[in-house]
Amino acid sequence: MEREDWDRRYGGTELIWTAEPNRFVVEELGDLPAGRALDLGAGEGRNAVWLAERGWRVTAVDFSPVALDKARRLARARGVSVDWALEDLRDYQPEQAAYDLVLAAYLHLLPAGRAAVLGGAVAALARCGTLLVVGHDLANLTEGVGGPQDPAVLYTSKAIVAELDGLTVRRAGRVRRPVDTVAETGGAVDTLVLATRD
């Protein structure tokens, strides 16, 4: 989806997702010592705000000004500071070797765009830094509910790992999470890849 599509989707007064962070973000990153974090495709800011509440110095990037307005409101309501950046990630060049954590959660781009973003994410990691990539898995089309219906933008752990040259993969595979919304009830199948720069 393009910026205008996301602006329309984020246009209501309520958050599309909850204000609570993604469960895999909490499970995988909750024990990391705070440092400098980069949230790529931050949307309404739930993960960035959660990280900031835990002492991280967060830069959160998204291309939807509507989403970032909601994210700023969420951060104010929670009493935390986040550096919000309005950028199209397909063109964004993060500071290199600068972040202890880079997060890309549910950032679904066509393969060339995804490769560019993940290349930038890898370059942005400092020594001993952690990268977490989580998003809808290709298997979600047949085994799960929700998420994009275009196979070209869905993840597999193999495809994500192939973009992480120079990192040590700590975990890569499919994970399941419950989905219970007005529109859908069931489970979603996601890809989760956790990698570090040694």
Give residue spans per PLM region.
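Conserved class I S-adenosyl-L-methionine
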Residues: M1-L32, G35-G43, A139
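A short SAM/SAH-binding and catalytic strip from SAM-dependent methyltransferases
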Residues: D100-R114
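A short glycine-rich, Lys/Arg-flanked "PGG" loop and its adjoining helix->strand segment in the class I
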Residues: A115-R127
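Conserved beta-strand signature within the Rossmann-like core of class I S-adenosyl-L-methionine
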Residues: C128-H136
